[in-house]
Amino acid sequence: MASEHVSAPYDLCIIGGGINGVGIARDAAGRGLRVLVCEQNDLASATSSASSKLIHGGLRYLEHYEFRLVREALSERETLLNIAPHLVQPLRFVLPHEPHLRPAWMIRCGLFLYDHLAKRSDRLPGSQAIKLERDNNYGQALKPQFTKGFIYSDCQVDDSRLVILNAMSASQLGATILTRSRCSEINHDGKLWSVRIEQASGASQVIQAKILVNAAGPWVAQIEDYLHKPEHGNKLRLVKGSHIVVPKFYPGDHAYILQNKDNRIVFATPYRDNFAMIGTTDVDYTGDPAQVAISDEEIDYLLSLINAYFDQPLSRADMVSSWSGVRPLYNDNTGTASAVTRDYVFDLSGGNGQQPVLLSIYGGKITTYRRLAEHALEKLAPFTGKSKGWTSTQRLPGGAIDSPDAYAQQLIQQYGWLSPALALRYAKAYGNLANAFLSANIEEMGTNFGHDLYASEVNWLIEQEWAQTTDDILWRRTRLGLLFDTQQTEQLAHYLDKRPH
């Protein structure tokens, strides 16, 4: 079934349902623009769900003199704490001192800059030097030679839920969000883009748009190739970053930032209560972004570094999960993959009567997505007539809470059957949206597919969050995939198959 013409042209057609695409969609829709997002798979199905899950200034970027990026990221850290208090949580980072890698004075200077580039906040205490004693949480799991260190603040985030809630906000503001929909053909008449969209269901349609935003992430160059823009040349540098997940191997709810002899750093962060996430790597990548996977060399690299710092040795047998993402970085011709800028760059063309406006996006990071979107709309203002930003103060869906801990207590009081752990999961994932699918009695929640994933929550994810498959639900909406066994996953799949579409 094909529909060749859609009523009025969209102001923006955005290719890519990652964090940059949905961030731009939300901002644009809130300015009154008519917006469509086209995502070939699920929202956040590529790079945006495979990050280190941090909202941070990027301490190591100071070594590359990227002061503008760090200042902007630290400012955005504060903004995201305010607009997404359910998703973004303060986290303390412990840096064990390795004097032969970086002298103490250098680290102190870096942390001083980090503290002072940021806005002062009671929620994010400043840095300080600490002793890594065997009788405290910071030093207990480390090898005895690590006696001194530093501690500073940053934040942690559920990256894929950040994408989902931006898409939800965009949709509430009038944007059309199409998932599992591929842009199979793109043409123009000099003034308008014509885009053929083919959906997984077999349906297809042709839409028109005044502006095309290429937010395709690792596929950004492929879109430019299709549009016959060979001048993109070496603008894109794909860098793979991989992570592993293991059972939590240290006490406390802090994270570690570990220095390696290759001058890189690796994080070990608490993940989903009983696990720790270790990453990332930086490896130049030339393959198909859809087929990216962690290599044996990356696994060895991460395990080797952890084992150099911690008493309890880890091996491949400890791994419960891993993932890899491809960062679509702007190629600044830096030698090593780890030194390539994480800043974003726009390529704006058209609007001259010969080609409609095209905006392609390179680089960026989860932390700065909101500012990237705001900046993109500023770039497009001469063509849209909409120049006023609004997203720095408007909370994301579910964000009308003070803190997840406090809201979890409210949920427990309101729904007597809730356990503290489940109430906190709901508070962190949904904030005050949890009320939309919670029932007074546990029986009304429907089937428990395992680990307190009830049919009521599953239905919400399908109806409100574009979820269609078990992977959508278990890995990108709830992160319960770490806990589900094969039988539980099959039971959920059976429910999805039988559910009316």
Can you say where each PLM-predicted feature lies in the sequence?
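Core beta-strand elements of the Rossmann-like FAD/NAD(P) dinucleotide-binding domain
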Residues: 8-10, 202-211
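Beta1/beta-strand and adjacent pyrophosphate-binding region of the FAD-binding site
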Residues: 6-18
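Dinucleotide-binding Rossmann-like beta1-alpha1 core, especially the glycine-rich loop
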Residues: 53-137
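C-terminal catalytic lobe of FAD-dependent flavoproteins
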Residues: 153, 159-161, 169, 228, ...
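Short hydrophobic core segments
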Residues: 15, 207-217
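A conserved short coil-to-beta-strand element within the FAD-binding core of flavoproteins
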Residues: 179-193
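Glycine-rich FAD pyrophosphate-binding loop
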Residues: 29-50
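Flavin (primarily FAD) binding-site architecture
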Residues: 214-229
